């Protein structure tokens, strides 16, 4: 994998991470309220670890599957699904957090 391709893939993973983090932040604010700073901080810290792992997993798989001859098509496809992947990551984490007790 070329450095250029690695940089492009990193940019996609960062987009996914940012979108998923925003969705989780909104979910926590709505579900738990903004006044529970300690709980919020801990849950967000946990989420960041999970999101980071998901982004790393995505990167690892994408690097393993990359075919240099169709890189541009693959990158375009991945970019098309960024929102979908972020939503999937976020909804899995929301299930982990569970409803407000």
Where are these regions (language model features)?
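Solvent-exposed interaction surfaces and binding hotspots enriched for charged
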Residues: 1-101
């Amino acid at each position: 994998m070329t450095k250029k391709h690695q940089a492009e893939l990193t940019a996609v993973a960062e987009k996914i991470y940012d979108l998923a983090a925003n969705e989780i932040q909104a979910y926590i604010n709505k579900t738990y309220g903004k006044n529970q700073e300690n709980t919020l901080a801990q849950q967000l810290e946990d989420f960041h670890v999970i999101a980071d792992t998901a982004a790393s997993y995505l990167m690892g798989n994408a690097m393993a599957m990359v075919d240099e001859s169709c890189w541009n098509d693959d990158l375009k496809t991945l970019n098309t699904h960024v929102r979908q992947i972020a939503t999937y990551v976020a909804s899995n984490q929301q299930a982990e957090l569970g409803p407000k007790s």
